Design a protein with these regions (language model features):
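Bacterial Sec-dependent N-terminal signal peptides
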Residues: 1-22, 191
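Non-catalytic cap/lid and distal C-terminal segments of serine-dependent acyl enzymes
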Residues: 20-344, 348-381
């Protein structure tokens, strides 16, 4: 079912991609080679906006799948549009040369070192100077190319914030080195590991790495693991990329009931901080300030009431005045804040302001009027 869905998405969107996709030969000084690369630029690209950059190895196999999912999620799920580059590696089995590692050390072989520099010092800088890219940069690879992405984690600052690693053919000791590095790196990282149903030594190493990654309890490390027992080396790509793409941009989705129960209600921090951190992270990673969802406002309001965290109502009220001007939202929440503090006069004046403004969501003028009448009765105004 999932596979058919994403195949449909691929067909739907790839039919109209011609004008947005270009293929060219990239002259690499580092490799001393001419490499085939393919670019996807959103059709409504604007130099005034910032776009996450996605680097896709095994471009012949993965590029179209990644583009289709990017278009689908940006159109229907509100995730940001992305700039995508695919590096072709099929001819002459270049992928095995580009991503080769030494069997004894597990580190890149000579050609691998040059390919590492080609991506990091030539291809990516070219795209970042040509287009207005966001700080958020993603790596997508499969098998040997998936393993190669891990090497960027060992730089002082990783070139990539996000990794979609599909059935990686892990170099020696990588199942231990990657978790150890992710546990110590001072950087927000999104890591999605995917494995199919193949039974081999690689699978055992992947499952060992998964166990170690799941044990990391650290702010800023976002890890997901998906296993598809019936998938083979071909279908795993179709199964895996769609779900992984959604998880990479999960912060763009409205706060879900599960998130509300498991993350917000259980947190010992002020409720408003959760909302503030969410939107600050989006701005830091993606380079723009996302409009606050009304759903998220209501989730934080409900949690503030449930946890008797009335201090969170004050900053929430100020945010609502900015995001939803002209509506009751900000002044109504502020009125409840003063009401909780026992400041009757301030609360009454604030509810009067709310009464004069437009209704929104569950808030009605009748509710503001009831608050005003109750305050007058309680405080004898």
């Amino acid at each position: 079912m999932i596979r058919n869905f994403f195949l449909f998405a691929s067909i739907l969107f790839c039919t109209g991609l011609k004008a947005q996709i270009t293929q060219e030969i990239f002259e690499s000084f580092k490799l001393q080679e001419r490499r085939d690369v393919k670019y996807y630029i959103p059709e409504d690209y604007s130099p005034e906006k910032k776009y996450p950059l996605v680097v896709v190895l095994d471009g012949e196999y993965l590029f179209d799948q990644v583009v289709a999912n990017s278009k689908f999620y940006s159109t229907f799920q509100g995730t940001p549009e992305t700039i995508i580059v695919g590096v072709f590696q099929k001819e002459n089995d270049l992928r095995w040369e580009d991503c080769a590692f030494e069997e004894d050390s597990g580190l890149p072989a000579e050609k691998g070192k040059l390919f590492f520099e080609f991506l990091g010092m030539e291809l990516i800088p070219y795209l970042k100077t040509t287009y207005n890219t966001a700080p958020f940069t993603m790596f997508v690879g499969y098998d040997i190319t998936a393993n190669f992405g891990n090497y960027y984690l060992f730089k002082e600052k990783s070139l990539f914030n996000a990794f979609i690693s599909i059935s990686p053919y892990l170099a020696p000791e990588m199942e231990n080195r990657v978790p150890a590095r992710l546990n110590e790196i001072n950087q927000q990282i999104f890591y999605h590991l995917i494995v199919g149903g193949e039974k081999n030594d690689s699978r055992n190493a992947i499952l060992q790495m998964d166990k170690a990654l799941k044990s990391i309890d650290k702010v800023g490390f976002n890890y997901r693991f998906d296993e598809y027992p019936t998938a083979n080396e071909v279908s795993i790509v179709t199964y895996g990329i769609g779900k992984a793409w959604g998880s990479m941009f999960e912060m763009f989705k409205p706060i879900s009931p599960k998130e509300y129960k498991e993350n917000i209600l259980t947190s010992e921090e002020p409720v408003y901080k959760y909302l503030d951190d969410k939107y600050n992270s989006i701005e830091e990673l993606f380079g723009f300030r996302k409009e606050v969802e009304l759903n998220d406002i209501m989730a934080i309001y409900a949690a503030s009431r449930k946890k008797d965290d009335f201090e969170s109502l004050k900053p929430l009220a100020e945010l609502c005045k900015e995001e939803f001007p002209g509506t009751m939202l900000g002044f109504y929440f502020e009125g409840e804040y003063y009401e909780a503090l026992g400041e009757g006069k301030k609360a009454l004046r604030t509810f009067e302001k709310a009464f004069a403004m437009e209704e929104i969501d569950f808030l009605t003028k009748e509710m503001a009027l009831e608050k005003m009448d109750a305050l007058k009765a309680d405080f004898g105004f």
